[in-house]
Amino acid sequence: MVKLRLKRCGRKQRAVYRIVAIDARSRREGRDLRKVGFYDPIKNQTYSNVPAILYFLEKGAQPTGTVHDISKKAEVFTELRLNQTKFKFNQ
């Protein structure tokens, strides 16, 4: 099972996180399948590769709670719904 979760980077007391698609059995610092975003809680900056996130969500990846909240702020789930409705109408 693939999860979208945070991977810690940065130095002591200055944590920044990468949003990665990773196998659920891997540890936090394990090898990721793909980097799909970036989150800096200190500067409150976020970057999301929305097409990559949508790809993994459509394939069944489960986001963790924090990644879900970050994605909701970036309005990823509204784009996911739009893609699903377009797919239904095209069939």
Swiss-Prot record:
Keyword annotations from UniProtKB, A to Z: Chloroplast, Plastid, Ribonucleoprotein, Ribosomal protein
InterPro entries recorded: Ribosomal_bS16, Ribosomal_bS16_CS, Ribosomal_bS16_dom_sf
Record has Ribosomal protein as a keyword: yes
SUPFAM superfamilies referenced in this protein's UniProt entry, alphabetically: Ribosomal protein S16 (SSF54565)
Coiled coil: none
Similarity comment: Belongs to the bacterial ribosomal protein bS16 family.
Protein name: Small ribosomal subunit protein bS16c
Species: Vitis vinifera
